[in-house]
Structures are given as structure tokens and as C-alpha cells.
């Protein structure tokens, strides 16, 4: 994977985090995973978590919930909510982030051109997650967990 160098990356991350936090509404307090993420932990810290600390967030979550039942309604509702929030963010916020990054080539293959949006400012870009959003839904919105890439990587 090619290294992405951008002198404004921390400011871009802050802007992204601020935009995501504004969208945080209608949280179900009766879901223990959402309650942990939004009330016990600082959600902003997870969204803006630097790459070197993502594994620490995973360890914290696993320590808080050592015996997750991945078939239980609580977990399924949490996963559905977080992936839904990611899709909303992808459609509404990520265009500006991509525009700020000035990234034109897939960081995986360094050959395919990647585009942020179509003419209607709708995000057409593909994103991969370093830590899978299906296994780690609490990292689905983490700025440094998102990898802007070409469609070949996704498929």
C-alpha cells in the first residue's frame, strides 16, 4: 500500500470528526453497546482515534464485553445502527473529506484512479475498512480506519 502524505491530515480528521458528531442523534440508551460507545466512552475519541490506537480501542471494547453473543438482538441492533450511520456519513460527509485529501490513485494498487463524487456531489467513491465494519462496527466511522480505494479492491 502506498503511503498517503498530507500536511493537513489532522485538520481533515478534526473536520470529519466534528461532522460525524453532529450527526449523532436518536441514540437508543437501552442498547448496552451504544450506551458504552456514546456515554461511557467518548465517541469523538473513537472517530478521531489515530491509526496506532485503533487496536487499543478494540482491546477496550473486548475488555468491556468479553462474551459477546454475535447472534443476540442487542449486538445485531448495534451493528445495524453503526453500519447505517457509516452509510449516512459516506453519502453526506465524505465528499468534502475526499476533496481535502487530494487522493487520486488507489493506495492499494497505485494504478487505478479513484474519484470522490459524481456531478451531483454524491459520493461515488469506494471505501475499505482496515478493521472490518462487520466485525468491528464501533470502528466503522473511525477516520483512520477508512481507506479510499478503487472498486477492484472492494470486490
Task: Annotate each predicted stretch with a short phrase.
Residues 111-145:
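Histidine-centered nuclease catalytic patch
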Residues 146-155:
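Short Cys/His-centered divalent metal-binding micro-motifs
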Residues 69, 105-110:
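A broad, low-specificity signal for short, low-complexity segments enriched in glycine/proline
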Residues 60-62, 92-102, 137-142:
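Short, flexible, mixed-charge glycine/proline-rich loop motifs
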Residues 1-94:
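N-terminal accessory alpha/beta regions
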Residues 78, 97-100, 118-122:
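N-terminal start-of-chain detector that recognizes signal peptides
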Residues 109-112, 152-153:
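Cys/His-rich metal-chelating microdomains
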Residues 105, 126, 149:
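The −1 position to Zn-ligating cysteines in a subset of zinc-ribbon hairpins
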Amino acid at each position: 500500500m502506498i503511503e498517503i502524505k498530507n500536511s493537513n491530515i489532522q485538520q481533515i480528521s478534526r473536520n470529519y470528526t466534528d461532522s460525524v458528531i453532529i450527526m449523532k442523534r436518536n441514540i437508543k440508551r437501552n442498547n448496552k453497546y451504544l450506551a458504552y460507545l456514546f456515554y461511557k466512552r467518548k465517541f469523538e475519541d473513537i472517530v478521531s482515534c489515530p491509526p496506532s490506537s485503533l487496536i487499543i480501542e478494540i482491546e477496550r471494547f473486548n475488555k468491556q464485553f468479553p462474551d459477546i453473543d454475535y447472534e443476540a438482538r442487542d449486538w445485531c441492533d448495534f451493528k445495524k445502527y453503526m453500519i447505517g450511520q457509516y452509510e449516512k456519513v459516506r453519502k453526506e460527509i465524505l465528499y468534502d473529506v475526499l476533496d481535502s485529501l487530494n487522493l487520486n490513485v488507489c493506495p492499494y494498487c497505485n494504478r487505478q484512479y479513484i474519484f470522490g463524487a459524481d456531478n451531483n456531489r454524491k459520493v461515488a467513491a469506494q471505501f475499505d475498512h482496515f478493521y472490518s465494519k462487520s466485525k468491528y462496527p464501533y470502528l466503522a466511522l473511525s477516520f483512520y480506519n477508512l481507506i479510499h480505494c478503487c472498486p477492484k479492491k472492494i470486490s
